[in-house]
Regions:
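Loop/turn-rich, solvent-exposed surfaces of beta-rich toroidal or solenoidal domains
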Residues: 275-281, 295-340
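Blade-level signature of beta-propeller repeat domains, shared across WD40, Kelch, NHL, RCC1
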Residues: 361-401
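Short, conserved, GDST-rich strand-edge loop motifs in beta-rich repeat architectures
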Residues: 16-17, 69-77, 167-178, 217-236, ...
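Blade/loop signatures of beta-propeller domains
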Residues: 13-36, 176-179
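Conserved blade-ending motifs and adjacent loop-strand segments that build the rim/top face
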Residues: 256-259, 295-305, 338-366
Length: 401
């Protein structure tokens, strides 16, 4: 933890969530955990963390990237925009509408994204120069020639040298068939290297953090008939796939529960974790050995993230019935002591079940700044979302005898 503090202090003059005027202190009434809520716009506007595969905060602690809407879905809202909080200047700036979940380079403080509408192409924005797009390349012709591109990537990930982006695109062919295409896009010239296509709903693609020739993808909606037919034939629920160049795809079965969702790479790329199913836990797969273990004792986990040193896990849980906008709580789990604490013990339903949210308001907790903080979304009964940043040191102390 001392090393993390030194990294955070490397950029002189940067405020922290504890000291910045952009945050207000929040204390959970049951667990006593202290978090810091981002303050921007009106109190009932939406401030939402990024999807858990993408880290919301840069390693130097200066920039926090988040989604924002003026208003909320109960009272009416404006368009969703990507924003950045600059903790050096204690200011918030608009990054526009990237058209997808961006890749955040947490070491060099910039984002990369691809957009299909309104100036299609792939772009970069430096977070210290917000709002100025730098075009990298056009949408690859190798995709547009196949048909109508529905989306370019579920959430963008880049190669280690940041020169290429992994795409898991969806393309509607002229005959109406949907093809799911995986491969690498060279950002300097728009050349696309296809790794192959699937007829099953293949998405959630994530390039391995330390290997440019390996991606983790999901068979989305594997509970529907095609996935169930595959399970009847092979015995395995076909959620998690390792994808490599040349069309090589390897199913990684969830051997303990034969069900999986929301998989994510470890930061060191040596393995990945996932959630079992409602009422289940967080599991982990080691690439080298194939060993699978339960890494978190929180039942009902739906999204999880592992700390850079693999000692801690955060996850969110819907304590009652799940829907888009249901009640949530978020947990921290100490793998060394096998103890947990609630970052927030329960948040009320954001939206009623008969009128669900369209903003994907799940908490999506994830570690940032080399494990110093956890970032997640917290819902409120009046229909607005808050963004919480929670110091990890207190969570370790609370779960250590």
């Amino acid at each position: 933890m001392i090393a993390n503090l030194m990294l955070a202090a490397a950029l002189t003059g940067v405020h922290t969530p504890e000291t910045s005027k952009l945050f207000e202190r929040r204390t959970d009434p049951e667990s006593g955990v202290v978090s810091y809520s981002l303050v921007y716009g009106a109190p009932d506007d939406n401030r939402q963390s990024l999807y858990f595969v993408t880290k919301s905060m840069t390693e130097d602690g200066r920039f926090l990237v988040f989604n924002y809407t003026k208003g909320n879905e109960r009272k009416g809202r404006g368009p969703r925009k990507l924003m950045v909080a600059d903790l050096l200047k204690d200011e918030v700036h608009e990054l526009g509408d990237p058209g997808m979940i961006p890749f955040v380079d947490c070491k060099k403080d910039y984002i990369v994204y691809g957009r299909l509408k309104q100036k299609p192409g792939f772009y970069r924005q430096n977070l210290d120069d917000p709002g100025r797009e730098i075009k990298l390349c056009d949408i690859p012709g190798a995709l547009t020639e196949m048909g109508r591109v529905r989306y370019l990537a579920t959430h963008l990930t880049l190669t280690r040298d940041r020169s290429k982006a992994f795409l898991d695109a969806s393309v509607i062919a002229p005959n109406g068939a949907t093809n799911y295409v995986q491969g690498l896009l060279t950002l300097a010239n728009g050349v696309f290297e296809s790794w192959g296509t699937t007829d099953f709903f293949c998405n959630h693609g994530q390039l391995n953090p330390v290997r440019d020739d390996l991606a983790l993808c999901a068979w989305e909606e594997a509970w529907l008939k095609p996935g169930q037919d595959y399970k009847k034939t092979t015995g395995w629920y076909p959620r998690m796939w390792l994808v490599e160049p040349g069309g090589k795809r390897t199913l990684v079965p969830a051997r303990d529960r034969n069900c999986a969702s929301h998989e994510v790479w470890d930061d060191d790329g040596r393995g990945f974790s996932w959630c079992g199913r409602p009422g289940d836990y967080v599991y982990h797969h080691d690439l080298a050995t194939g060993r699978q273990e339960r890494w978190c004792g929180i039942a009902g986990a739906r999204h999880n993230n592992v700390s850079p040193d693999n000692r801690y896990v955060v996850c969110d849980e819907a304590p009652e019935r799940w829907w888009r906008g249901c009640k949530w709580r978020v947990a921290f789990w100490n793998r060394e002591t096998e103890r947990g604490v609630w970052i927030y013990s329960t948040r009320p339903a954001l939206m009623p079940r008969e009128k669900q949210s369209r903003l994907h308001p799940d908490p999506h907790p994830h570690f940032v700044m080399n494990g110093r903080y956890v970032v997640c979304t917290a819902n409120n009964a009046d229909g607005h979302m808050d963004l919480y940043v929670t110091p990890v040191d207190q969570l370790v102390k609370m779960t250590t005898p």
